[in-house]
Amino acid sequence: MGSIQNTVHYCCVSRDNQIMYAYNNAGDHRNNESLAALCLEKTPPFHKWYFETRGKKTFGFLMKDDFVYFAIVDDVFKKSSVLDFLEKLRDELKEANKKNSRGSFSGSISFSNVQDQIVRRLIASLEFDHTCLPLSSPSIDGAEQSYASNSKAPLLGRSNKQDKKKGRDHAHSLRGIEIEEHRKSNDRGNVTECSNASSESATYVPRRGRSGGSQSIERKWRRQVKIVLAIDIAICLTLLGVWLAICHGIECTRS
């Protein structure tokens, strides 16, 4: 292990919170094991892979086929490189299991027969690729930082100040949304009232026109009736006068 630096501190494979294989670098074994146990208990659900950096160490997860592939590495590695390391670890362990079981791979990996030299070789490849890689572009770093911040899950806890600040920001944003919705609701109410008022005024004018027209027709009808009655009365009076003149009053009735 002379060429292997202390950059990959720990890696393991677990299933149902039971560690089936673990590689612990020649450092603080107990500290690495306790950190791994704490992180595996809080494995983020609904993720295919997940990373979080704390205290110059990156904690990487790869969830595949009911297994969790976990690693604790220094934060000098890109997250994409650590993900590639975990995927190669998964493939190498499956291949080793196939060889040990003479090709009868049943879906469950037997890690007791896996040699540490496989993991050492993968760690050496990871460190070699890191030393040969050029400086990462800002776009790649920004994308990785954006993913880490968006999918953040509190593996090792979070400070109360950050929680309070995010809570206040969330409350302010909700308050702003409520005020905006209230303003939009008032605007919609004013528009509705104006449209109702305009429609009522538009319908009110024709009603007045219809009532005025019926009243004028009624007045004309009454005037015509009065004229007809006056003509009838005049004719009746004329006939009565002629009859009285011929009969010299009411003498015709006496005979």
From Swiss-Prot:
Non-SNARE longin protein involved in membrane-trafficking machinery. One of its GO terms (biological process) is protein transport. Keywords: Coiled coil, Membrane, Protein transport, Transmembrane, Transmembrane helix, Transport. One of its GO terms (cellular component) is membrane. The gene is PHYL1.2. Residues 170-187 have a biased composition (Basic and acidic residues). This is Phytolongin Phyl1.2. Residues 151-216 are annotated as: Disordered. Residues 188-202 have a biased composition (Polar residues). It is a single-pass type IV membrane protein. It is found in: Membrane. Residues 12-115 form the Longin domain. Belongs to the synaptobrevin family. The chain crosses the membrane at residues 227-247. InterPro entries: Longin-like_dom_sf, Longin_dom, PHYL.
